[in-house]
Amino acid sequence: MVSMRDLLECGVHFGHQTRRWNPKMKKFIFGERKGIYVIDLQKTLRYFRYTYNIVRDAAAEGKTILFVGTKKQAGGAIKEYAEKCGMPYVNHRWLGGMMTNFGTIRQSIRKLEVIEKMEEDGSIKLLTKKEALMLTRKKEKLLAYLGGIRYMKTQPDMIFVIDTVKEKIAVQEANRLKIPVVAPLDTNCDPDLVDFPIPGNDDAIRSVQLFCQEMAEAINEGKALREQDGEANEEQPISEEEKKEVLEEAMSEEDFEGDKE
C-alpha cells in the first residue's frame, strides 16, 4: 500500500501552472508555489487507499479492468503493469468506439488472429511476395492498436486512465456505458467525470509509474483473494474463407478504420 513518502519521492504533489487549472479541483489543492499548484497529499493518500481497495475488490470478483494511457510518459508503464496483473491495455492510441462499438473492434482482432494463423500453418508462404508483405503490414498495424486488448472478450467492467484530459474520448465512452473510471487527477482535470479519483500528478514519469504499480498490486491482491484460475481463452477455428477475406482487405490498401481521427 502506498505511503506518504512514496507520494513525495515520486512528485505526486506537483500540479500544473496556476493558469492551467480546473476550478473544480480547488478542494484537492493545498496551495501554490512559484506559479505551480501543490496538491494536498493528505487527501491524495486517503483517496489512494480507498481506490486501491475498490480496485482490489473488483479484481476479487473477477472483473476486467482496462488500463488506458497513450501519452509518451504513460505508454511504457501502462503496458508493463497491465501485463504484470494480466489486464488488457491501450497504450498506442485510443480508437473511437473501442468500448461503444466493441463488436467492430472484435472483428478487427479476429483479422489479426487470421493473419497469425496463416503464418503459423504456412499458408502465407503460398502467396505472392506483395500479398505476404501487405498482410504483414496489416498485422503490425492491428497489433499496435489492438494487441493490448486482443484477449478482452467483452467490454471492461472498469477502466484505469492516466490523463483524463488527453484520454477524454475513452472517459466519455466509459461514462456513456456507465463503466466506472479510476484515474489520478491533476489540477487541470474535471473530477465530475471520474468515479474513483486520486488527486495527483499525471505527467511526471515516476508519478505515473507509481499509480500504475499500485493499481497492478491491488489487482493481483484481489486475484489472490479470488483463489481460482481464470478461464482459458478458447481458440476459434479459422476458415479458408476468413483467410481469403483478410487477404483481399489487406491488398485493397484501405486504411484501417482506426486510422481516421
UniProtKB/Swiss-Prot annotation:
Ordered alphabetically, the record's keywords are: Ribonucleoprotein, Ribosomal protein
Q: Which PROSITE patterns match?
A: RIBOSOMAL_S2_1, RIBOSOMAL_S2_2
GO molecular function annotation: structural constituent of ribosome
Q: Which GO terms describe its biological process?
A: translation
- Biased-composition ranges for Acidic residues? 230-239, 248-261
Instruction: State the residue spans of region: Disordered.
Output: 222-261
CDD domains reported in the protein's UniProt record: RPS2
Gene Ontology annotations for the cellular component aspect, listed alphabetically:
cytosolic small ribosomal subunit
Checking InterPro entries in the record gives: Ribosomal_uS2 (IPR001865), Ribosomal_uS2_bac/mit/plastid (IPR005706), Ribosomal_uS2_CS (IPR018130), Ribosomal_uS2_flav_dom_sf (IPR023591)
Superkingdom of origin = Bacteria
Recorded family membership: Belongs to the universal ribosomal protein uS2 family.
Q: Which PANTHER family match?
A: 30S RIBOSOMAL PROTEIN S2 PROKARYOTIC AND ORGANELLAR, SMALL RIBOSOMAL SUBUNIT PROTEIN US2M
**Know the name of this protein?**
Small ribosomal subunit protein uS2
Please report the organism this UniProt entry assigns to the protein: Campylobacter lari (strain RM2100 / D67 / ATCC BAA-1060)
